[in-house]
Amino acid sequence: ATKPDCRGQGIFTQMLNLLNETAKKQGMQGLYGRGVTFHTFSQKTGNTCGYRDCAITLCVLPADRVYKGMGIPKDRISTVYSYLPLVRHEKAAIYPPRHHSAFIEGIYNNLSIDMISLPCDEKNIQLQQQSSFKVDILPNVNMADIKLYAYGRDAIDKLMETMKMLLKRKIDGISLYLDLGQPATAIFCSEFEKLGFFIAGAIPLLYFRNTLILQYLNNISPDYSEIRVYSDFARSMLEYIRERDPNRDL
């Protein structure tokens, strides 16, 4: 936390700008940040320094965190992913799920990255015999991350088996990261949503060159009135996500 007598001097903004310049000199292609939604200060600073919002992950942090001068959150805390391109990105050639195509295109427009939606022929998708997953359990926040590296014929069954294991451990939520560069993502997304996953957003260079983020909440109904976002685009994303959240009426 910043000392009260040091606040309002733009120190955080200066530090973030220095970080951005250092990363650019080191040849990095982009940076991403995650601002909590208990307040909008970090989101605002990120936007001021050129970061643009691209995903909202709900209830990913425990509610026991204390924010000086702002109290303790009532519920688990959500975060806003934002991304800053440090170089000119080549056009993103991706396979977005058809029902989220406009939403994902809006995200890339917000990031000022050109994209093209590639057609996907479900009948000609090549699947491996077995899927390749990586599961990371995050005990400090009681969450889990799943990265799906390769789609196999067992993708649905393997994901269901993994979910069963995680829910048995009473994990509060799961983030599922999918490769938008794989045609199978366009097809399997809706199948994963039938299991209770729903959209969070999309971001470049996180696990994959272009990543689709889905999320799953374990019997948690977010209080959307307590989720504070700074940018107009984040507000439109939040409404889109809320409309597709199967937990909103729990």
Can you say where each PLM-predicted feature lies in the sequence?
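Conserved beta-strand-loop-alpha-helix junction that forms the acyl-donor binding cleft
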Residues: 33-43, 52, 60-61, 176-185
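Conserved catalytic-core motifs of GNAT/GCN5-like acyltransferases
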Residues: 32-34, 50-72, 198-210
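Non-catalytic interaction/regulatory modules that flank or connect domains
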Residues: 105-200, 205
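Short, cationic low-complexity segments
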Residues: 95-126, 227-250
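Conserved active-site tyrosine of GNAT-family acetyltransferases
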Residues: 42-46, 192
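C-terminal "cap" of GNAT-fold acetyltransferases
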Residues: 61-96, 208-234
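Conserved GNAT acetyl-CoA-binding A-motif
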Residues: 23-36, 169-179
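Conserved acetyl-CoA-binding loop-helix of GNAT-fold acetyltransferases
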Residues: 2, 8-23, 30-33, 48, ...
